[in-house]
A protein has these predicted regions:
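Intrinsically disordered, low-complexity regions enriched in small/polar residues
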Residues: 3-4, 36, 169, 232, ...
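Small/polar loops that bind or transfer phosphate-bearing groups
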Residues: 3, 13-16, 177-178, 225, ...
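Proline-centered helix-kink/hinge sites
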Residues: 72, 98, 196, 226, ...
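C-terminal alpha-helical cap/extension of soluble enzyme domains
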Residues: 77, 201-247, 251
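Alpha/beta enzyme core
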Residues: 13, 17-71, 79-195, 199, ...
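Histidine (H) residue identity feature
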Residues: 1-2, 103, 115, 225, ...
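Single conserved hydrophobic/aromatic residue that forms the stacking wall/gate
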Residues: 1-8, 12, 244-255
Length: 255
C-alpha cells in the first residue's frame, strides 16, 4: 500500500559519472545516486546519448561506483537491452551488481535522448511486457522498478496518464514521465498516479528548471539532476585547459 505522496520526503538524485563524482555527491549530503545511459556514453566513451552503450558498459560503471559508495543507486536501463528474456537477465545483473532500483522506458530499442525530437515509442502492451519481465526477476519489495514514459511529447498528457496506470498495474512502483513541460502537468499526473513521480531536471532540456518547492507542491517526490555537476566539471576543465594553452601555467589564478 502506497502512502500518500504529500507525506513522502523529497529525494534528490545526482548522476554519478564515475566513483570520484559519487564521493563528491556524498560529501555534499546528497542521499541517492543515479547512473544514466547518457552518463556512461558521455563520460566513459566520449559518445552522445544514442543507444550506443551496452549492458556490460553500464554494469561496469555501476560496479565501480557501488565499490566506493553505499548510497542507493538508481540505474537507467534504457529499453532493457532486448526482449523480455533479456530484460529479466538485465534486471538480475543490475541487482547483483548493487543497483537499488532501475528504470525501463517505452521508447523503441533504437532510442534517442528523451529531450530530442523524433522519438518513437512502443505500444503500452509491449512496454507492460518489459515491466513484467523485470518485475518477475525482482524478489525484494524495496527494489525500485521505475517506468519511464516518453509518451508526453508524442501523445500528450491524457495518454501519458493512461500508459502510467497500465505500467503500474504491470508492476512498476515509480514513474518517470520524461520531458514534461509544466507544473500543471506534473500536478495532474500526481493526482492520478499512486506511486512516486520523478522529475528529470536537465539544463537545455524540454522541462523548465523548476525549483524543489515548485516540484514538491506539484506532487513530485524524486528530483533528478542528471548532468548539472558533469557540465560544471566540463566547463571548469575547459577553462583551465584554455588558460594553460594561452598563458604560462605558473601564472594561473588558484581555483
Amino acid at each position: 500500500h502506497h502512502q500518500p505522496r504529500r507525506q513522502r520526503q523529497m529525494c534528490i538524485r545526482d548522476r554519478a559519472i564515475n566513483p570520484y563524482s559519487a564521493l563528491l555527491a556524498k560529501k555534499t549530503g546528497i542521499k541517492a545516486l543515479y547512473i544514466s545511459g547518457a552518463g556512461v556514453a558521455n563520460a566513459s566513451f566520449g559518445l552522445p546519448d544514442l543507444a550506443l552503450t551496452s549492458l556490460d558498459n553500464v554494469l561496469e560503471d555501476l560496479r565501480r561506483i557501488r565499490g566506493i559508495s553505499d548510497l542507493p543507486i538508481l540505474v537507467d536501463c534504457d529499453t532493457g537491452w532486448g526482449s523480455a528474456l533479456n530484460i529479466s537477465k538485465t534486471t538480475k545483473e543490475m541487482i547483483s551488481a548493487g543497483a537499488s532500483g532501475i528504470h525501463i522506458e517505452d521508447q523503441v530499442s533504437e532510442k534517442r535522448c528523451g529531450h530530442r525530437p523524433n522519438k518513437e515509442i512502443v505500444s503500452s502492451d509491449e512496454m507492460c511486457d518489459r515491466i513484467k519481465a523485470a518485475r518477475d526477476a525482482i524478489s525484494d519489495d524495496d527494489f525500485m522498478l521505475m517506468a519511464r514514459t516518453d509518451a508526453f511529447a508524442k501523445e500528450g498528457l491524457e495518454r501519458t496518464i493512461e500508459r502510467a496506470e497500465k505500467y503500474i498495474e504491470a508492476g512498476a512502483n515509480a514513474l518517470f514521465p520524461e520531458a514534461i513541460t509544466s507544473l500543471k502537468d506534473y500536478k495532474a499526473l500526481s493526482e492520478k498516479i499512486s506511486v512516486p513521480i520523478l522529475a528529470n531536471i536537465t539544463e537545455f532540456g524540454m522541462t523548465p528548471l523548476f525549483s524543489k518547492t515548485e516540484l514538491k507542491n506539484a506532487g513530485v517526490s524524486i528530483i533528478l539532476h542528471p548532468l548539472s555537476a558533469f557540465r560544471a566539471m566540463s566547463k571548469a576543465a575547459l577553462e583551465v585547459l584554455s588558460l594553460i594553452h594561452i598563458s604560462e601555467p605558473t601564472r594561473l589564478e588558484p581555483i
